[in-house]
Amino acid sequence: MLQVYNTLTREKEIFKPVKEGEISIYACGPTVYNMPHIGNYRTFLMTDNVLRALEYLGYRVKLVMNITDIDDKTIRDSKAAGMTLKDFTDKYTAEFFKGLDMLNIKRAFAYPRATENVDGMIELARKLIEKGLAYEKDGSVYYRISGFPEYGKLSRLNFDNILIGASVDVDEYDKDNPRDFALLKASTPEEIERGIYYDSPWGKIRPGWHIECSVMAMNSFGPTLDIHTGGVDLIFPHHENEIAQSEGATGKPFVCTWIHGEHLIVEGEKMSKSKRNVFTLPEIVEKYGGEVVRFMFLSVHYRKKLDYSEAFAENAKNNYLRLKETLDNLEFSLKGADDKSYPGDLETLKALPELETQFRHALEDDFNTPRALTVFRELSRTANLYLEAGKNRKVLEKVHTLYRKFSDVLGLFAQAGKEEIPEEVFRLVEEREAARKKKDWGTSDTLREKIRTLGYIIQDKKEGPNVKKAEES
């Protein structure tokens, strides 16, 4: 039974989708004004983990992630770069997708851009004005938060602190100073000169940040969606304002379950440019590899802060490589498998269903990937114990199938097995194993060298030889 922690209720709840068997997810995507740092990608990976787990659990899932390509930051920084807003945001949108590929993050069903949905934003603002929940002032349109009594229910804001009639134009502001926020902003003369404006009943405007997500989410799924994901930093004001806009307009619940990922910190401190501890994803991937970074993120529950350090990353790398080595051993051993019976056959086959049950329960418990990795390591141990003496084809195939199922759900080892070990190398390894059993060490060394000249290395382990391409060592 799937249980998910809901930020709205601050409780772990039994999850029930709006439509049985189908799940809608809207994820706050990147604001494309710079290279996203590793903390941003931790949140994107959290959404990917939720998607993969739900699919494994048998749901049909539709994920939509937005691209914020017009807001205060994109306008400011595109000007500083001397680029048009579109050219500037296209550049960083491309970088965002490169990062997804580095981490083997599955593509969403759609990536709507804010600039493609402005008509819907103008319509939502008009509807809110009609309901008395918004008003025009100096060419901008503001949301009247005093008109929505439930304002603050997500962030647990004290409604008594609301400043009646006070408004704020910036997209991000403090929880202790809640004000009427801008739905649509009057374009400045400079923005109009740069072509950053849209015609509306209130003049030339451009959208505020918060209305963008309300419109793109409801355009994708209607008034109510199952899950909305994002980082904890978005709870206020962004997600709070999404609720006010959407529910104020429709009178229906906007999101059933809110899922928020905690911060990534660096050696106990918040990332900041002044401390020179802000790392982009390419920097970390170049050092450790994309799958190691993914493994590192998986090893800490999404609702806990991840404290990044080189020691932590090295530990993740070592654990990842141990699991990868087991997969390599399994796939190599399958080439030499037979139909004989071995002492560990029944015990190994008996262990597999229980391990999958444990793996499933881990994911059903609020997408607990650290616990799922613990089960994965136990499967690795079971596989290695069997490989020490057994090579029954049926057993190896079942172990390998479950191993691959776990790795696919966790998004690991995507490239493993795509390049087959050449038949010539496999034959030489078999000949070398035969020589080793006869203690013919001279022939064994000669064959090792032949294997090396073909671009592969061999490592002798108690569970059998491990063959890798030379550059992987």
Curated annotation (Swiss-Prot):
Coiled coil: none annotated. Its cofactor is Zn(2+). It is found in: Cytoplasm. GO terms for molecular function: ATP binding; cysteine-tRNA ligase activity; zinc ion binding. It is an enzyme of class 6 (ligase). GO terms for cellular component: cytoplasm. Gene3D superfamilies: Cysteine-tRNA ligase, C-terminal anti-codon recognition domain, HUPs. CDD domains: CysRS_core. This is Cysteine--tRNA ligase. It comes from Methanosarcina acetivorans (strain ATCC 35395 / DSM 2834 / JCM 12185 / C2A). The gene is cysS.
